[in-house]
Amino acid sequence: MHRLKQASNIQAASGRGRHRVYAIAQLLGDDLLLSIWGGALPHIGSVSITQPRASGQAPERLSTTSSVYNFYGHKDESVARLCAERIAAACNKKTVAVAGIH
């Protein structure tokens, strides 16, 4: 049996009461998994899969390419996409963000 290397976690929270939002970022080797949830009914509403790449206009700068999946009726894309793209570009890591806030 292979021994698993423990992943590193970073946790954060912001807001109060029903407006409180939580996030956990977990390093998985060279990649990053981000979970964002909060409100009265935490859930999985949208998933953003983001990869850093050289910008087409300024190759010395990092940009990103994303694919997003939204579960029917959910509008969490803006949170998942924004967080994944900013983190992927800043950290130069493939990033998957899962978001669900009600």
Spans of model-derived segments:
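Extended amphipathic alpha-helical scaffolds
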Residues: 1-11
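Conserved mixed alpha/beta catalytic, RNA-binding, or beta-rich assembly cores of soluble enzyme
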Residues: 10-102
